[in-house]
Amino acid sequence: MEINKLQVEAIKSGSVIDHIPEYIGFKLLSLFRFTETEKRITIGLNLPSKKLGRKDIIKIENTFLSDEQINQLAIYAPHATVNYINEYNLVRKVFPTLPETIDRILICPNSNCVTNHHLINSSFILKEDQFFNMNLKCKYCEKEFYKKIVLSCQ
């Protein structure tokens, strides 16, 4: 008989971002500005996972992520799930899907891009090349980059 024990304390109401690849949890806290709130946030790092081997998890009390926020998670955590909790019960489970654009959370690798010199939020259009590689095109400088290059700038 397998005993399930919570590695991170349960929340009464709010959002749980589960199945985050290991070492990505802190990055998501920063990029999505989750720490700019008065709400209690609990994070678990390098937890055992059957799916991933190791995973991170973020629990945000009394906060429900928007569909836009959930889908933007997919660029970093494509297999994550977002669980909405109410009265300690799961009321909705959402699987992120890549949006057509990613706004505000990425930095353009082009040092000459206006977003790197002025208070302008970045915006990238997601594109796939003929080999199904994910590329991101900056809305402002119009340069296109491999996903790996953009994510390494963060």
From Swiss-Prot:
Transmembrane residues, as ranges? none
Q: Name one GO cellular component term.
A: aspartate carbamoyltransferase complex
Q: Which domain of life is it from?
A: Bacteria
Q: Which Gene3D superfamilies match?
A: Aspartate carbamoyltransferase regulatory subunit, C-terminal domain, Aspartate carbamoyltransferase regulatory subunit, N-terminal domain
Q: Coiled-coil stretches, from where to where?
A: none
How is the cofactor bound, in the record's words? Binds 1 zinc ion per subunit.
The GO terms this record gives for MF are:
metal ion binding
Q: How does it assemble?
A: Contains catalytic and regulatory chains.
- Could you tell me which PANTHER family the record lists for this protein? ASPARTATE CARBAMOYLTRANSFERASE REGULATORY CHAIN
Annotated protein name in UniProt: Aspartate carbamoyltransferase regulatory chain
* Organism, scientific name: Buchnera aphidicola subsp. Acyrthosiphon pisum (strain APS)
Q: Source organism lineage?
A: Bacteria, Pseudomonadati, Pseudomonadota, Gammaproteobacteria, Enterobacterales
